[in-house]
Amino acid sequence: MVSFDATEALAPYREGRGYGAILFDRERLRQADASLFSPQSWGDRARPVDAGGRGGAWFVDAPFGHSVLRQYLRGGMAARVSRDRYLWKGAGRTRSFAEFRLMRELIKRKLPVPRPLAACYLREGVGYRAALLMERLENVRSLADHAQVAGRGAPWEATGQLIARFHRAGLDHADLNAHNILFDAGGHGWLIDFDRGVLRIPATRWRERNLKRLHRSLLKLRGNRSREDVDKDYARLHRAYELAWGRGY
């Protein structure tokens, strides 16, 4: 369960035929409006993110610091129905508000995640659109990048230890792939993209599901490397994970 946070602020707004709300960190933002979530409003201070994901993300040079703006987009078969609209089930269950609050809870638990700054939804009828603004992690590279460039020299053991920390805290990451694991120049690891993530009682089934998803993503990214090489790298990651899990950190 995600606890209540007194530093959150809520600002309702209207746009066209819809109405919505913005949830924001009042320690970082004095006020918030819908323009925060429009890349057009940022002009040349916003540029598209071209690594991983399905688009809909921008690096933003904002007055309150370097940030990432992400609009929620659907993938797969669901995108044929609507690219950016989700079924309304209540404000607290919007993708943006849920991810904002989950990230803040993970930070409270001393886990390395980017700080969320603001989240919004705009409801029109039975559907809504949503977006999230968060701090940008500077000078980081994804595990996907490390794996393609360094291969065996990528931080496999550090990745296993990092995932074990999050699993110990109960995080079930809905999309644990090599693009969502980042390392800075000092070797410190971070996780990103907590859309549809939840906190659970640690259990083998969902932990292994997360790890298998990561393994599949590494296989997809292997390029000219053999499956055997990728499996060996993943085995190193998994051994480090099991050791860290067994130690309790």
Curated annotation (Swiss-Prot):
Write out the annotated subcellular location: Cell inner membrane
Task: List the catalytic residues.
Answer: 175
Asked if Nucleotide-binding is a keyword of the record, the answer is yes
Q: Which residues form a coiled coil?
A: none
Documented EC number(s): 2.7.1.166
Q: Which UniProt keywords apply?
A: ATP-binding, Cell inner membrane, Cell membrane, Kinase, Lipopolysaccharide biosynthesis, Membrane, Nucleotide-binding, Transferase
- Superkingdom of source: Bacteria
Gene Ontology molecular-function annotations: ATP binding; kinase activity; phosphotransferase activity, alcohol group as acceptor
GO biological process terms, semicolon-separated:
lipopolysaccharide core region biosynthetic process
Q: Say yes or no: keyword tRNA processing present.
A: no
- InterPro entries hit by this protein: KDO_kinase, Kinase-like_dom_sf
Q: In which pathway does it act?
A: Bacterial outer membrane biogenesis; LPS core biosynthesis
Any one Gene Ontology cellular component term annotated for this protein = plasma membrane
Q: What is catalysed by this protein?
A: an alpha-Kdo-(2->6)-lipid IVA + ATP = a 4-O-phospho-alpha-Kdo-(2->6)-lipid IVA + ADP + H(+)
Q: Top-level EC class, please?
A: transferase
The topology of this chain with respect to the membrane is: Peripheral membrane protein
| Purpose of the protein | Catalyzes the ATP-dependent phosphorylation of the 3-deoxy-D-manno-octulosonic acid (Kdo) residue in Kdo-lipid IV(A) at the 4-OH position.
Family affiliation: Belongs to the protein kinase superfamily. KdkA/RfaP family.
The record ties this protein, via NCBIfam families, to: PRK01723.1 (NF002475)
The record's HAMAP family line, in alphabetical order, gives:
KDO_kinase (MF_00521)
Q: What is this protein called?
A: 3-deoxy-D-manno-octulosonic acid kinase
To which species is this protein native?
Xanthomonas euvesicatoria pv. vesicatoria (strain 85-10) (Xanthomonas campestris pv. vesicatoria)
Name of the gene encoding the protein in the UniProt record? kdkA
